[in-house]
Amino acid sequence: MHEAQIRVAIAGAGGRMGRQLIQAAMAMEGVQLGAALEREGSSLLGSDAGELAGAGKSGVIVQSSLEAVKDDFDVFIDFTRPEGTLTHLAFCRQHGKGMVIGTTGFDDAGKQAIREASQEIAIVFAANFSVGVNVMLKLLEKAAKVMGDYSDIEIIEAHHRHKVDAPSGTALAMGEAIAGALDKNLKDCAVYSREGYTGERVPGTIGFATVRAGDIVGEHTAMFADIGERVEITHKASSRMTFANGALRSALWLKTKKNGLFDMRDVLGLDVL
């Protein structure tokens, strides 16, 4: 067994992403699976987390109480729902635990709670933990600065039928990257739906389109369209393991941080490019 540099706890251990995170934690050099959590009353409580994830016996039992495992982890990884994540955030803030947050769908109050907690603990909060997606966000900033003022900009995203929020957190991050590069606020220029007689496209807006179907892991395209040409920048994920590995990489990166709010671009050093 490799020597652990960081011990992690995984929220939502029985979910699609939770199982991928457990597999990644058990396989990644420098990481130790310290705890796995499920909601109270879950039929999965008492299971071996590794066996649950199809990764072999881990010796870590799935539990519902953070209090019971507070001494077993350094960083808490959460890809669940906003209400649950905020409960976990309060606990980690109280006990000085770092967090990696991949949950999407937070309202403004939830985002503010994360910002406030980051004054005391270190948090990596990102809409997407894929290396490729975060490289794409950097490319979008550069494309927007060159083409954004004279292009019609549309963002199209597709996910599996079980995803509960729309647009996806990644699509919103794409919009924010583009809007920021154009010195705009996404709230002021986003168009999230079109139906019926809409009139002509309003110049300077950023449109969003959402697809929910089948088992699509995640596809995102940003379109910069002008008369006679268009540029499309696309990312397609074929496995959730890319997100899981990015989250574990973030947990390792957090080991030297006392407090602060970071995203994957900080982890990858993309802001220096």
From Swiss-Prot:
A Gene Ontology BP annotation from the UniProt entry: diaminopimelate biosynthetic process
Keywords on record: Amino-acid biosynthesis, Cytoplasm, Diaminopimelate biosynthesis, Lysine biosynthesis, NAD, NADP, Oxidoreductase
Reaction catalysed by this enzyme: (S)-2,3,4,5-tetrahydrodipicolinate + NAD(+) + H2O = (2S,4S)-4-hydroxy-2,3,4,5-tetrahydrodipicolinate + NADH + H(+); (S)-2,3,4,5-tetrahydrodipicolinate + NADP(+) + H2O = (2S,4S)-4-hydroxy-2,3,4,5-tetrahydrodipicolinate + NADPH + H(+)
Subcellular location per the Swiss-Prot or TrEMBL entry: Cytoplasm
Active site: residue positions: 159 (proton donor/acceptor), 163 (proton donor)
Pfam families listed in its UniProt record: DapB_C, DapB_N
GO molecular function: 4-hydroxy-tetrahydrodipicolinate reductase; NAD binding; NADP binding; oxidoreductase activity, acting on CH or CH2 groups, NAD or NADP as acceptor
Assigned EC number: 1.17.1.8
SUPFAM superfamilies: Glyceraldehyde-3-phosphate dehydrogenase-like, C-terminal domain, NAD(P)-binding Rossmann-fold domains
Similarity section: Belongs to the DapB family.
Quaternary state and interactors: Homotetramer.
HAMAP family in the record: DapB (MF_00102)
Stated name of the protein: 4-hydroxy-tetrahydrodipicolinate reductase
Taxonomy of the source species: Bacteria, Pseudomonadati, Pseudomonadota, Gammaproteobacteria, Enterobacterales
